[in-house]
Curated annotation (Swiss-Prot):
This is Aliphatic sulfonates import ATP-binding protein SsuB. GO terms for molecular function: ATP binding; ATP hydrolysis activity. It comes from Pectobacterium atrosepticum (strain SCRI 1043 / ATCC BAA-672). It is an enzyme of class 7 (translocase). The gene is ssuB. The complex is composed of two ATP-binding proteins (SsuB), two transmembrane proteins (SsuC) and a solute-binding protein (SsuA). Its EC number is 7.6.2.14.
Length: 266
């Protein structure tokens, strides 16, 4: 059977079971007509890193994720994995949205295995087990809560063994408790499989709790690039997390002053 069912609660770094996709963004610029949404973005993201991208609405963070997913093309610049175009890794990339986007006329297990051929049902069942929904395989999506629907969407991504997982506000519509449960689930699965993660979120506390690195996008540029050098599992409400969260929030809420990135670690 496919090894989806292991549980890791106290790991400190991702295992190499699935090698993550390394990313290089060289001078990425994106225009919509006369409006520049991303402006000369330069980033290096190593294999297996968990990166959170934060910023005000309209700053370009979701646009950046869409470029990485291949849903849109950059106006200029290069997206690379190693020395190859990132488009060469599209089969290893999966994207989760704020809405689960399940097909209501298909049962849960069929949504997980959507588009697959051959003997996929066992793999789909394993993926559902890994997200805690082993007993909901034959239910209809309408019978699920919002959090359960997002778990199905996560299982649908996991069945493809992604090396790059892109998360565009996937927890934004969930209640506080369900959101914390989903955060823990995503973190544990990442620790187990070792893929590269880019999470776009408006929730700075979520970014600090989950990520190895938090990047703030300001007016289409990297305004802040912070390493979260704290052991896992992270204790919510700790002084160090609160200190780092306050620093990022202060920058998010302040008027933009300089487009140059600042780097720090805590």
């Amino acid at each position: 059977m496919t090894a989806f069912t292991d549980s890791i609660t106290h790991a400190h770094s991702p295992s190499p079971l699935t090698k993550g996709t390394p990313l290089a963004l060289d001078a990425i610029t994106k225009h919509y007509g006369h409006r520049t949404v991303l402006n000369d973005v330069q980033l290096r993201i190593p294999s297996g890193q968990f990166v959170a991208i934060v910023g005000r609405s309209g700053c370009g963070k979701s646009t950046l994720l869409r470029l990485l997913a291949g849903l849109e093309a950059a106006s200029s610049g290069e997206l690379l994995t190693g020395t190859a175009p990132l488009s060469s890794a599209k089969d290893d990339t999966r994207l989760m949205f704020q809405e689960a986007r399940l097909l209501p006329w298909k049962k849960v297990i069929d949504n997980v295995g959507l588009g697959l051929r051959g003997n996929w049902r066992e793999k789909a069942q394993d993926a559902l087990t890994s997200v805690g929904l082993a007993d909901r395989a034959n239910d209809w999506p309408a019978a699920l809560s919002g959090g359960q629907k997002q778990r199905v969407a996560l299982a649908r991504a996991l069945i493809h063994h992604p090396r790059l997982l892109l998360l565009d506000e996937p927890l934004g519509a969930l209640d506080a408790l369900t959101r914390i449960e989903m955060q823990s689930l995503i973190e544990n699965i990442w620790l187990q499989h070792g893929f590269t993660v880019l999470l776009v979120t408006h929730d700075v506390s979520e970014a600090i709790a989950l990520a190895d690195r938090v990047i703030l996008i300001e007016e289409g540029r990297v305004g802040l690039d912070i390493t979260v050098d704290l052991p896992r599992p992270r204790r919510r409400g700790s002084a160090k997390l609160a200190e780092l969260e306050a620093r990022v929030l202060e920058r998010v809420l302040a008027p933009t002053s300089s487009p140059l990135p600042q780097q720090a670690a805590i």
